[in-house]
UniProtKB/Swiss-Prot annotation:
Main localisation: cytoplasm
Originating organism: Alkaliphilus metalliredigens (strain QYMF)
Superkingdom as given in the UniProt entry: Bacteria
PANTHER family: 12S RRNA N4-METHYLCYTIDINE METHYLTRANSFERASE, S-ADENOSYL-METHYLTRANSFERASE MRAW
The name this protein goes by in its record: Ribosomal RNA small subunit methyltransferase H 1
Length: 311
């Protein structure tokens, strides 16, 4: 199976994880296994990589690529949100590092029938995990106008959210919206012509919003970081690559909260809440792709890497 994906910030991620030879590492977004392959190069015979992906195509292709590493690899078909359960099933209590790449893989974008891309016509789907029964089609055809406006505004940060929601509802009253091409045409009608001259494709933000809603992407980030920190050995690291401001803001804020969890009023001279620091932030500012990487992989342009270390 051909599952091509160019790993973003590859060298930077491996350095950030500060890999211990016999450590246990979790790649929560296995994808094309590019990051995992580099982690395995550093791991010794006693080391272990746990690769998690909810996309069965990615998992199958990664299994073939990583087959030579034998028992050093355990692959799990699941969502990284279930990290607690996954580690429990593997009878693992502590780990040395976690890597999350929150972007949609190049393969998923390019695989027309998955319905992630506004550049190719396909059924409205956008499910990362195709075992799920809930797809983009359900959102577009079943959500109320107010619900559509909310997700397009919050998750897509689109100034035309209200108009787009109105036009979606008007269009689906005539006939269900079934394909990405239909969806793009509705958005083009909704966004004024003058606003379409500059900036990204008019459908980019709405497609992002719907994808986030289908896969509940933002809700699971915070819980996963907390679970990773709970299982992390002191000195272990959490490295997270985000691709838009909503994700990056969540990662930054959760890291800050875990670094300074005290909820006591500022006038208290001594902490009384007894909430203990779990991590220290390694990256004061996010690590960005180099110019060299941008030339090779333009899709990496919006990537940001943040790292925290367990204390």
């Amino acid at each position: 199976m051909n599952f091509e994906h160019t790993s973003v910030l590859l060298k930077e991620c491996i350095e950030a994880l500060d890999i211990k030879e016999n450590g246990i590492y979790v790649d929560g977004t296995l994808g094309g296994a590019g990051h995992s392959q580099e982690i395995l190069k550093v791991l010794g015979k006693e080391g272990l990589l746990i690769g998690i992906d909810q996309d069965e195509n990615a998992l199958s292709a990664a299994g073939e690529r990583l087959e030579e590493h034998g028992t050093k690899v355990k692959l799990v078909h699941d969502n990284f949100h279930n990290l607690d359960k996954i580690l429990e099933n593997l009878e693992i209590t502590t780990i040395d590092g976690v890597l999350l790449d929150l972007g949609v893989s190049s393969h998923q974008l390019d695989e027309r029938e998955r319905g992630f891309s506004y550049m190719q016509d396909a059924p409205l789907d956008m499910r990362m995990d195709r075992r799920s029964g809930f797809s983009a089609r359900d959102i577009v055809n079943d959500y109320s106008e107010k619900e559509l406006e909310r997700i397009i505004k919050e998750y897509g940060e689109d100034r035309w959210a209200r108009r787009i929601a109105q036009f979606i509802v008007q269009e689906r009253e005539l006939a269900p919206i079934e394909t990405t091409h239909q969806m793009v045409e509705v958005i083009k009608k909704a966004v004024p012509k003058g606003a379409r001259k500059d900036g990204p494709h008019p459908a980019k933000r709405t497609f992002q919003a719907i994808r986030i809603e289908v896969n509940q992407e933002l809700e699971i980030i915070e819980a996963t970081i907390e679970a990773a920190a709970k299982h992390m050995k002191p000195g272990g690291r959490i490295a997270i690559i985000s691709f838009h401001s909503l994700e990056d803001r969540i990662v930054k804020n959760v890291f800050r909260r875990l670094q300074n969890p005290c909820v006591c009023p500022p006038q208290f001279p001594v902490c009384k809440c007894e909430k203990e620091q779990m991590v220290k932030i390694v990256t004061r500012k996010p690590i960005l792709p180099s110019e060299a990487e941008l030339e090779v992989n333009p899709r990496s342009r919006s990537a940001k890497l943040r790292v925290a270390e367990r204390v």
